[in-house]
Regions:
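N-terminal cap/lid segment of alpha/beta-hydrolase-fold proteins
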Residues: 19-45
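Accessory cap/linker subdomain of secreted extracellular hydrolases
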Residues: 154-226
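Catalytic active-site module of serine/aspartate enzymes centered on a nucleophile-bearing elbow/loop
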Residues: 272-273, 278-308
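Short beta-strand/loop motif that positions the catalytic acidic residue
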Residues: 231, 237-239
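Alpha/beta-hydrolase active-site loop
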Residues: 104-126
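Conserved alpha/beta-hydrolase
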Residues: 72-99
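Short alpha-helix in the alpha/beta-hydrolase fold that links the catalytic acid
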Residues: 233, 246-257
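Short, surface-exposed "cap/lid" segments of acyl-processing enzymes
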Residues: 43-80
């Protein structure tokens, strides 16, 4: 009886271990600027790979900044692995700039594009994956569009803007602080023409901070609606109606310029792909609640798109 019980317990333990090992996770360093985590499902066959590019700011590979912890892309990577999809997610260069001795005024959006391209080229040389898809979140959507051109097999825009940065910010200011939008418009024109904005309301200092202006100017060179139409690969556009950072109008505008793209609009989903049943307070709280699950529509939507 004891032997039978022992064998039974061994079998249960083996099954549990097998279930927990649905994927392998490893740190992969591309170069001194780019380091991330590769999550690969256990499979005898070649699997597709998704490269995630994070949103604006000092965001790490899991989707967190220094003020919040939601682990969105960590959870998403594990869920996609269960569906037979490998993922690579990496820290934004801003997240590790102090350790690299990089100053804020030295950072350009082009650096982020270079980082994304270096990741794509690294995995293309590997020749291990069935196909490579790029998925950009927020600002990462624009970066991904540019990097994917001529390099990736498909592109996924997650809560990305359709309009150039200055238009997005001016519209937001007009709604939140009417009157200041005119000052912002003048400052953006100065920044684009002369490289420096000097005439703006002091209330806009956080936007037009001196050391931030070179980065802003580099970002202003790109228009998402112009970049995405140059892609000759399958496109998936994803948004949620509880997004406090990117308005639903951006989704419609992006859809207009690439009508052939697949489009997924998720009810009650916020910017970090979590379900929000309450109001703004519940939405803000979710940014520090890593236990919240990713919306299932996102997992199935990405899986179906990548595997088609």
């Amino acid at each position: 009886m004891k032997n039978t019980l022992y064998l039974f317990m061994c079998l249960i333990t083996t099954l549990c271990l097998a279930q927990s090992k649905e994927y392998n996770s490893a740190v992969v360093k591309i170069n001194k600027y780019v380091e991330g985590t590769l999550v690969t499902p256990y499979s005898d066959d070649s699997v597709p790979l998704i490269i995630f590019i994070m949103d604006a700011g000092a965001i790490n590979r899991d989707g967190n900044d220094r003020m919040s912890k939601n682990d969105t892309f960590k959870h998403l990577a594990y869920e996609l692995a269960k569906s037979g999809i490998a993922t690579y997610r990496y820290d934004k260069r801003l997240f590790k700039m102090d350790g690299l001795g990089i100053r804020e005024h030295e950072i350009s959006l082009d650096h982020f594009i270079e980082d994304a391209i270096s990741v794509i080229e690294f995995f293309k040389k590997n020749k291990k994956y069935k196909k490579i898809s790029i998925a950009g979140h927020g600002q990462g959507s624009l970066i991904g569009m540019i990097a994917a051109k001529g390099r990736a097999n498909s592109f996924i825009s997650i809560a990305g803007n359709a309009m150039p940065l200055d238009q997005v910010i001016i519209e937001q200011i007009a709604k939140q602080a009417p009157g200041l939008d005119k000052s912002a418009a003048v400052a953006f024109e100065q920044l684009k023409k002369s490289g420096r904005a000097t005439e703006y309301d002091p209330a806009l200092e956080s936007i037009f901070r001196y050391d931030l202006q070179p980065f802003m100017r580099s970002w202003l060179q790109y228009n998402p609606s112009e970049e995405i139409v140059e892609l000759e690969i399958p496109i998936l556009i994803m948004y949620g109606d509880k997004d406090l950072q990117v308005e639903t109008a951006q989704a419609e505008k992006l859809k207009e310029v690439v009508p052939q793209a697949d489009f997924l609009f998720v009810q009650n989903m916020n910017h970090i792909l979590k379900e929000i049943k309450g109001g703004r307070l519940d939405n803000h709280k979710s940014y520090n609640e890593p236990f919240r699950k990713i919306m299932p529509e996102i997992i199935s939507g990405i899986t179906n798109f990548v595997k088609q």
